[in-house]
Amino acid sequence: MEVRFYDSVDDALLKFAVILAKAEGKWVFCKHKERDTYEIPGGHREPGEAIADTAVRELQEETGAQDFAIKPVCAYSVTGKNRVNDTGKEMYGMLYYAEISGFDQKLHSEMEKVCLFDELPEALTYPEIQPKLVQEAGRRGYV
């Protein structure tokens, strides 16, 4: 699995948005109803949707975030087969960072619950990808 980071890429290449988020100084992770692991909020871009709108929609749906500040960090790509890429071809996404100050009590997605962690949880859904996203956001001064 290879993860690469870019200052920018052609917008048409961006297929998903992933949002590193903190609330109360802690990392925000989601637990999917069908998995025993934790993941960073995010998801696929809908046809005709701006990638920034994808990020806002996914953050709200998966975490119940109501009050937040969100900003783009960088574009990135993942090459290699994983749960959402059965071809292994390079796929591009946009990484965002959000500070959440208020949550809705009800989730509107496939997520079972939202958890706050001081450190990254050990049981990650994408252990070869998620730590690299956090590291890159830190390198760029976001965390």
Residue ranges of each PLM-predicted region?
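Acidic, metal-coordinating catalytic segment for phosphate/diphosphate chemistry
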Residues: 1-18
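Active-site-adjacent beta-strand/loop module that shapes the phosphate/pyrophosphate-binding cleft
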Residues: 76-104
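Short connector loops at helix/strand junctions that flank enzyme active sites
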Residues: 14-16, 22, 33-35, 40, ...
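NUDIX/MutT-family hydrolases
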Residues: 95-97, 105-140
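Conserved hydrophobic "DFG−1" position in protein kinase catalytic cores
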Residues: 19-21, 29, 98, 116
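Short helix-loop capping/hinge motifs at secondary-structure junctions, enriched
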Residues: 27-28, 101-107
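A short coil-to-beta-strand element that immediately follows conserved catalytic motifs
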Residues: 66-75
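Conserved Nudix-box catalytic region and its N-terminal flanking loop in Nudix hydrolases
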Residues: 22-61
